[in-house]
Design a protein with these regions (language model features):
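N-terminal Rossmann NAD(P)H-binding glycine-rich loop of SDR-like oxidoreductase domains
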Residues: 1-23
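SDR active-site strand-loop-helix element
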Residues: 6, 29, 75-76, 113-119, ...
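N-terminal Rossmann-fold cofactor-binding loop
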Residues: 28-39, 53-54
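NAD(P)H-binding glycine-rich loop region in Rossmannoid oxidoreductase-like domains
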Residues: 48-94
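Catalytic helix-loop patch of NAD(P)-dependent Rossmann-fold dehydrogenases
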Residues: 93, 97-101, 120-158, 162-167
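NAD(P)-dependent short-chain dehydrogenase/reductase
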Residues: 138, 150-193, 199-200, 207
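Mid/C-terminal beta-alpha module of Rossmann-like enzyme folds, strongest
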Residues: 202-207, 211-259, 288, 292
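Amphipathic terminal alpha-helices
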Residues: 273-292
Length: 292
């Protein structure tokens, strides 16, 4: 089975390429040059299509038609931690419009589309939201991701949240935390999270491709909830870094997702957070060797 991962150099994309390559014929697109990422040993040159601008519809169409994949995985998006997230045009183009364009192109080549949404479609005032709850985000990022949810045709949209290592950037929680060696950071005891490390989420995606080819529509995919303070303590423990984590109780937000529907259909049972962080920290990928 041929898989096309769009956005292969991103935090999720590169883990999908790593995890899926053992079982599938995996192709990927990246915005830059593959030579810049050669030290990681992740990308096969002949299956990596470099310098792809997905906002160029002609280029995107040519890539999909030439690869002719069975499954297209959309790992492209503007995340809220980057400056581009303040640019409404760029955010809407990638988070809202691109998934629908991909759904159209997937239908044309007879492929299944898997795309990722976020727990941030909810404002965080109430946790354990289900697929039946109406998204109520108030910020551009959350609204743009909601608009990009594709629930018709051959598309599967997974609402979730991810943490993980990055290839040369420091936008997200794990890289931020590891960059604070020898310092003190705040751990939010009332910030509730139910996502996954990218390594684990890639395992979930592999299972969906292998064993649940019929799954379509919108599903919440979540772990058992943890607060950010306890999460940082686990990161400190398994990465073996000297960082003081200070309890901070005042900030309150709960974007935990109820994934009962997904678990019933797929028989999915999440690993414990202790196990997931231990697995993530043991990843041999040489992230720290990258010239930032």
């Amino acid at each position: 089975m041929k898989i096309l991962v769009l956005g292969g150099s991103g935090m999720l994309g590169h883990k999908l390429v790593q995890q899926l390559s053992g079982d599938f014929d995996v192709w990927t697109t990246i915005r830059g040059e593959v030579e810049r990422l050669a030290n990681f040993g992740i990308f096969e040159r002949e299956r990596t299509i470099e310098q792809v601008d997905v906002e160029d519809s002609d280029t995107l169409t040519r890539v999909i038609e030439s690869v002719a994949p069975n499954v297209i995985f959309n790992a492209i998006g503007v995340v809220k931690q980057v400056p581009t997230a303040k640019n409404a045009a760029a955010t809407i183009a990638l988070n809202s419009l691109l998934p629908h364009q991909l759904a159209y192109l997937a239908e044309r080549v007879g492929a299944r589309l898997i795309t990722i949404s976020t727990d941030c479609v909810f404002d965080g005032t109430r946790g354990m939201t289900t697929e039946a709850d109406h998204p109520n985000a108030t910020d551009l990022y959350g609204k743009s991701k909601h608009l990009g949810e594709v629930v018709e045709g051959n598309a599967l949209t997974l609402r979730t949240s991810i943490i993980g290592r990055e290839l040369g950037t420091r936008h997200s929680l794990v890289e931020w935390f590891l960059s604070n060696r020898g310092k003190t950071v705040k751990g939010f005891t009332n910030a509730i999270y139910s996502g996954f490390p990218t390594f684990i989420f890639a395992e979930i995606v592999a299972d969906l491709i292998k064993n649940h080819a019929e799954l379509r529509g919108l599903y919440h995919v979540s772990s058992d909830a943890i607060n950010k303070y306890d999460l940082l303590l686990l990161l400190r423990k398994y990465y073996g870094v000297e960082i003081e984590v200070e309890r901070f109780d005042e900030f309150k937000i709960d974007r935990s997702l109820d994934s009962t529907k997904f678990r019933e259909v797929t028989k999915f049972k999440p690993r414990s957070w202790e196990e997931m962080i231990a697995i993530m920290a043991s990843d041999p990928t040489p992230y720290d060797s990258f010239s930032r």
